[in-house]
Structure formats: C-alpha cells, structure tokens
A protein has these predicted regions:
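Conserved signal-transmission helix
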Residues: 1-36
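Conserved short strand/loop->alpha-helix "switch" segment adjacent to the catalytic nucleotide/phosphoryl-transfer site
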Residues: 28, 32-38, 117-144, 166
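Conserved DHp (HisKA) dimerization/phosphotransfer helix of two-component histidine kinases, i.e.
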Residues: 43-124
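Conserved ATP-binding N-box helix of the HATPase_c
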Residues: 50-57, 61, 131-160, 190
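Short beta-strand/loop element within the Bergerat-fold HATPase_c
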Residues: 156-171
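Glycine-rich acidic phosphate-binding loop
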Residues: 171-178, 215
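ATP phosphate-binding glycine-rich loop and adjacent ATP-lid/helix-beta elements
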Residues: 178-210
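C-terminal end segment of the histidine kinase catalytic
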Residues: 216-221
Length: 221
C-alpha cells in the first residue's frame, strides 16, 4: 500500500512538473512574441521616419541644382534603410555581426558618398563578432556623419573604427570644422543609453567627430 501511495505521489509530481514545464514554455513564447512585437513596432516607427524623409528628398529632386548628386544621396539613404533592416532581423535572431561584414556595409556608404561628391574613406579595424547594437550604432553614426559632411561640403572625410581598451572608438576627420554638426536625437539617445558618447575631439591637429561605446561581445582585431 505504501508503495502504491509513493507511486501515486510520484505520478502527481511528474504531472505537476509537466504542467509547470508547459506553462513555462507558454510564458516563454508569449514573452518572445511580446519582445518581437516591440521590436517590430520600433522598426516600423524608425522606417516610417526614414521613408518619410526619403520621400521628401525624392519630391524635391526635380528642383535641385545638382540632380545627379541628389539622386546619389537618395541611393545612399536607400542603402542605409536596407542594411538597417538586415541588422534588425539579425538582432531578432540573436545573432552577432562580423566586423568584416560591417566593414562591407561601411564601404558601401563610402562608395555612395563619393558618387554624391564627398571623397570618403572608412577603415574598419574590427574583424571578429560584434554585438548587433554596437554595430548598428556604428553604422548609423557613419551614415549621419556622411550626411552632415555632404551638407557642409566637408570633403575629404576620413573614418576609422577600432577596438581600444574596454571600448569601441569610431573617429571621423572631415574637411571642415564639425563643431556645429548636430546628430539626430534618436542616435544620440541610443548612444547615451548604451553608455557611449559622441563628441568633437582633436584628431591629428584637427577637429574631428568621435563615437565611443563600451565593448560588449566584440573581440579585438
């Protein structure tokens, strides 16, 4: 009889554990769905703003004095939107981005900037895995720096990204003083929220723009 009671208790415990596991799995799926919903809402807001800005550029294209440069800048914006979507979906999948791949993204921006009339060269000193958030902030920083340099006609523009002790540093040296440059509130808030900063600094006896971020899952080199 005692054995039967023990077996009955064990059966109830196993059933309870199975229910707890099932409940935990349901909660996990709900949390994942909620997190993905929040991410997609964030992407939707972000893309809506970028597409709206892009639509304004396209609308004003016939009135511009240099339509070729304007068309090149629109292509630059489209490239940025495409790559940001790529980074977003990598983040949803919990994947990292190799520094070499980020280097390809940055080379694309530099090439399109040159078509827009801005002589640009960007060196990516990262080759190992990077956290998606850090990679996204570096990519957005490069895009906004190029956009500001185009408006200021600050050619040439030299940029280099490297890992230092405990931090990522992304420097840009433009052809004119960037002290009055203003980055978007979205970018500055995201950088600050990640424990980083964007600031003007003396670079090679000239004033440059520097983004610093704390190192996360990145590897040096």
């Amino acid at each position: 009889r005692l054995r039967q009671e023990i077996q009955a208790v064990q059966a109830r415990l196993e059933a309870a554990n199975a229910l707890l596991r099932e409940e935990g799995e349901v909660k996990r799926r709900l949390m994942t769905a909620e997190a993905n919903r929040a991410l997609f809402e964030q992407l939707d807001r972000d893309m809506e703003q970028r597409v709206s800005s892009l639509a304004g550029l396209i609308k004003s294209l016939p009135e511009t004095e240099q339509p070729r440069d304007a068309a090149a800048y629109i292509t630059l914006c489209l490239c940025h939107i495409k790559r940001r979507c790529n980074l977003f979906f990598l983040a949803c999948q919990g994947e990292a981005l190799l520094g070499d791949e980020l280097g390809i993204y940055l080379d694309e921006l530099a090439e399109l900037a040159r078509y827009s009339g801005l002589q640009t060269l960007i060196r990516c000193g990262q080759s190992g895995p990077m956290e998606i958030r850090s990679a996204s902030l570096c990519y957005d920083f490069a895009f906004e720096t190029i956009s500001l340099a185009l408006k200021a006609e600050a050619s040439p523009l030299m940029g280099w990204l490297e890992a230092e002790v405990g931090r990522l540093t992304f420097r840009f040296l433009p052809g004119s003083d960037p002290v009055e440059w203003r980055f978007s509130e979205e970018l500055t808030a995201a950088v600050t929220g990640s424990g980083g900063q964007i600031a003007c600094k003396d670079l090679d006896d000239a004033v440059g723009i520097c983004l610093t971020l704390p190192l996360g899952g990145e590897t040096r080199g």
